[in-house]
Amino acid sequence: MIAFRGVSKVYTAGGREVAALRNVSLRVEAGEIHGVLGQSGAGKSTLIRCANLLERPTEGSVSVDGQDLLALSPEALRKARQGIGMIFQHFNLFGSKTVAANVAYPLEVAGTPREAIRERVEELLSLVGLSDKAQAYPSQLSGGQKQRVGIARALAPRPRVLLSDEATSALDPETTRSVLGLLRDINQKLGVTLLLITHQMDVVKAICDSVSVLERGRLVEQGKVTELLAHPSTRLHQLCFPAFAAPTDAPSGRRVALTLAGEHARRPLLGTLARQFDVDALLVEGAMERVGNTRVGRLLVDLQGSADAVSQALAYLREQGLTLEEAANG
C-alpha cells in the first residue's frame, strides 16, 4: 500500500517559488495498478519521485506498507527502497553491460551471492521473454526489449511496489500494448503493487484498476477507472469522451445522451426500447471504449415515438441505472 498525505513540493527557480505539487493526498491499495494521469507540467514525475524519496516533499508524508519514509534513518530508507522498484521512460541501462549484467546489477550492489544472482537473472529473463538475449548489449535491442530489461532489473530485488515513470511513452503502439500486457501479467502473477504515471488515456484504459487525475499540481479526482468513466461529470470521462459536436440539424425526437458501462454496454438496450415501448432510437453520434475487461460507451440518440411512449422509455432507462442527460429540442 502507498499513501500520500497532504504532499506538496515547492521548487525555487529564478528567485521565485514554483509549486509542483499542491496538497496531494491519495492511496494506492496493495496489489492494484494505479495510474496517475496528467499532461506535461501536471506534477506526475514529481509525485512518483516522492514515492521513494528521490524527491523529498516540502510538506506532507509518504508511506509504503505502513512505513513513513520521511521518518526513516538513512540506513532504514536504503533498506525500504529495496522493496520499491522503478521503471524509467528512457530505460537507463548500462550500455557497456550485457542484458544479464544489467539485470544482475542491483543484486550485486546488495551483496547477493553469485549463484543466487545467476538463478534470479535466468528467472527474470524468462519472465520478460528475453532468455535468448542474456549476452546481448542494449545497443542490439529494440525499444520494447530495452524496456523489458528495465522491468526485469526493477524486479530483481523482489520489490513489493513498482513505480513506472512514463514507461511506454517512447514506444510505438504495438510495443506499448506488449509492455502493458507484461506489466499486467507481473501484477497478477507476483501481486506487485504498480504505481504508474502517464499522459496517455490508452494506458489507463488498458491496465489500470484505479486512477488519479493531476492538473497543475493538484489532484482533481481519483477512483476506480470504470466508475469514473461511467459518470459524465467526472474529469476522466470528459478526457475519454469529448463533448458531442454541436448538432447541425434539429433533433428528430427527444435527444438524449446515454452513458453505458459494464453489463449495459453488452445489452441490446436500444432494441429493447423498440420492442417494449414502440420507441425508435436513432443513433446520432457515439463511441465505445474497452476498459480492461469491460466496456464503457457514450451515445447520443434521438428517441422517436409518442410522448407517453418516450417518457416510459426514459423511465425504463433510469430504472436500469443508466446515466442519461436530455438535450433541449431545437
Swiss-Prot record:
It is found in: Cell inner membrane. GO terms for cellular component: plasma membrane. GO terms for molecular function: ABC-type D-methionine transporter activity; ATP binding; ATP hydrolysis activity. SUPFAM superfamilies: ACT-like (SSF55021), P-loop containing nucleoside triphosphate hydrolases (SSF52540). Residues 2-241 form the ABC transporter domain. It is a peripheral membrane protein. It comes from the Bacteria. Its EC number is 7.4.2.11. Gene3D superfamilies: 3.30.70.260, P-loop containing nucleotide triphosphate hydrolases (3.40.50.300). It is an enzyme of class 7 (translocase). CDD domains: ABC_MetN_methionine_transporter (cd03258). ATP binds at G38, Q39, S40, G41, A42, G43, K44, S45. It catalyses: L-methionine(out) + ATP + H2O = L-methionine(in) + ADP + phosphate + H(+); D-methionine(out) + ATP + H2O = D-methionine(in) + ADP + phosphate + H(+). Signal peptide: none annotated. Keywords: Amino-acid transport, ATP-binding, Cell inner membrane, Cell membrane, Membrane, Nucleotide-binding, Translocase, Transport. The complex is composed of two ATP-binding proteins (MetN), two transmembrane proteins (MetI) and a solute-binding protein (MetQ). Belongs to the ABC transporter superfamily. Methionine importer (TC 3.A.1.24) family. Part of the ABC transporter complex MetNIQ involved in methionine import. Responsible for energy coupling to the transport system. This is Methionine import ATP-binding protein MetN. It comes from Myxococcus xanthus (strain DK1622).
